[in-house]
């Protein structure tokens, strides 16, 4: 799964995509685009096709309230939902006529499907942009969680936390997801802060999707954590790590144990992981490749498909920036040079990718990880400029060898089905800790 923001994809002036489609849904429909129009180095849609990914995971594409829809310079990740069942207007060539955004989003999905690439939506049902919402106007305070003193719960750290355990909001969530799946042919849903949704609601969503034609193929996964304390009603269970056993098959969650074992804590910039030389974490790496089925992590999955191995996402630092910041050989008072392409950091990047791509389950990575994407040390770029967030297509050319390494890993997974095997009783595909020492593991995953 390749995580991508619609505007990031085509904002770079060097991308070769037409000006009228830059930052828009229709950028995904342009074929034959090349870097600076050189006719050689593929960008955009053709680049995606060449990479070998199975799915594009799009950051929020429903209507959100944090940017003026007619301001081409405005930028936000989009985790500010207003109208859950309407495409975002700032990604349409004409935000003032509703039919345009609907048609153009469908054209984007259709183009990706023709290329054999599935489309996953990032959905944010855990809060609304503000309290002046259609939900609040329908039945005041019914759709929101409250503390005993009457204040609105803020488990999202964005305010206005919704109450999935209430029957009508649960029903709304189920119908909304099914609407996107049926009307827009969406292939999967990533639930933001999934731990703010109760397990009963998540299972209801999975059940409803399974009843649709080929619905069992639709992916459902999310973040098994919340941002702050939640006033979820007593007697319901949050969809977090501790309750993974209460979730149906076909509902997965991001595995931060894998992430942190590989590169270190996302909350401490200078803390490294296995790829930085912390060999004491090698046991965690071996557990990760087997989907943590050995019970050594914080999760107790029934099978490896319940966990998503990853090392980078839109949150926190890009993988490249994190590796630069956590390099143990960097002097504490020295500023890292994020544009310097040194072999040491490139090796760590390759090793991190090699581990993720040889884990059981369905790996996930942030767009640009494959060419050392940098945001120059910005760890939370949700409302930074598009210039900082854009996909730098020149960098993709400069790091062509790293891109080819990722292509090779993706081809390896397609060729050997054992990498995706998730059955709990499946023979271990890789190796045991007492058979291969950490240094040998590192050598096996390094070109």
Task: Please place each PLM-identified region on the residue numbering.
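Hydrophobic faces of well-ordered beta-strands that scaffold small-molecule active sites
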Residues: 2, 56-58, 119-121, 189, ...
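Acyl/amide activation-and-transfer machinery of modular secondary-metabolite enzymes
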Residues: 382-391
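A solvent-exposed, charged loop/short amphipathic helix patch at secondary-structure junctions
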Residues: 14-36, 322-342, 386-387
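Short, flexible loop/turn elements at secondary-structure junctions
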Residues: 5-10, 52, 57, 62, ...
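Catalytic cores of secreted or luminal carbohydrate-active enzymes
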Residues: 397-429
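Conserved alpha/beta catalytic core and glycan-binding cleft of carbohydrate-active enzymes
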Residues: 206-212, 216-372, 380-382, 417-420, ...
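Substrate-binding/active-site clefts of carbohydrate-active enzymes
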Residues: 7-184, 190-213, 218-219, 230-231
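Alpha-helical packing segments of well-folded alpha/beta enzyme cores
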Residues: 44, 104-108, 169, 173-180, ...
């Amino acid at each position: 799964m390749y995580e991508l923001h619609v505007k990031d994809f085509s904002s770079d002036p060097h991308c070769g995509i037409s000006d009228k489609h830059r930052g828009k849904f229709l950028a995904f429909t342009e074929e034959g685009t090349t870097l600076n129009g050189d006719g050689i180095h593929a960008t955009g849609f053709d680049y995606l096709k060449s990479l070998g990914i199975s799915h594009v995971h799009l950051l929020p594409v429903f209507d959100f309230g944090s940017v003026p829809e007619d301001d081409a310079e405005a930028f936000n990740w989009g985790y500010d939902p207003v109208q859950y069942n309407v495409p975002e207007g700032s990604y349409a060539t004409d935000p003032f006529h509703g039919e345009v955004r609907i048609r153009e989003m469908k054209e984007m999905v259709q183009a990706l499907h023709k290329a054999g690439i599935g489309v996953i939506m990032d959905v944010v049902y855990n809060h609304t942009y503000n309290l002046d919402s259609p939900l609040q106007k329908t039945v005041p305070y019914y759709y929101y969680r409250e503390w005993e003193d009457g204040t609105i719960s803020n488990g999202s750290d964005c305010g206005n936390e919704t109450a999935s355990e209430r029957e009508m909001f649960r029903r709304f969530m189920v119908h909304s997801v099914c609407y996107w799946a049926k009307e827009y042919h969406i292939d999967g849903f990533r639930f933001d802060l999934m731990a703010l949704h109760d397990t009963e609601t998540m299972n209801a969503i999975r059940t409803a999707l399974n009843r649709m034609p080929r619905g069992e193929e639709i992916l459902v996964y999310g973040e098994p954590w919340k941002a702050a304390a939640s006033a979820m009603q007593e007697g319901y269970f949050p969809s977090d790590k501790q309750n993974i056993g209460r979730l149906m098959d076909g509902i997965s969650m991001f595995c931060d144990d894998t992430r942190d074992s590989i590169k270190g804590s996302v909350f401490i910039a200078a803390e490294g992981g296995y790829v930085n030389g912390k060999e004491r974490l090698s046991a965690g790496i071996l557990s990760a490749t087997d989907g943590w089925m050995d019970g050594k992590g914080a999760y107790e999955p029934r099978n490896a498909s319940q966990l998503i191995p990853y090392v980078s996402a839109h949150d926190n630092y890009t993988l490249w920036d994190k590796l630069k910041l956590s390099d143990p050989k960097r002097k504490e008072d020295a500023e890292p040079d994020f544009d310097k392409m040194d072999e040491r950091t490139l090796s760590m990047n390759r090793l991190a990718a090699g581990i993720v791509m040889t884990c059981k389950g369905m790996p996930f990575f942030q767009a640009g990880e494959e060419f050392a994407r940098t945001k120059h040390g910005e760890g939370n770029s949700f409302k930074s400029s598009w210039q900082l967030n854009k996909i730098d297509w020149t960098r993709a050319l400069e790091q062509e060898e790293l891109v080819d390494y990722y292509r090779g890993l993706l081809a390896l997974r397609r060729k050997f089905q054992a990498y995706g095997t998730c059955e709990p009783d499946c023979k271990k595909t890789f190796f045991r800790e007492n058979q291969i020492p950490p240094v040998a593991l590192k050598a096996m995953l390094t070109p």
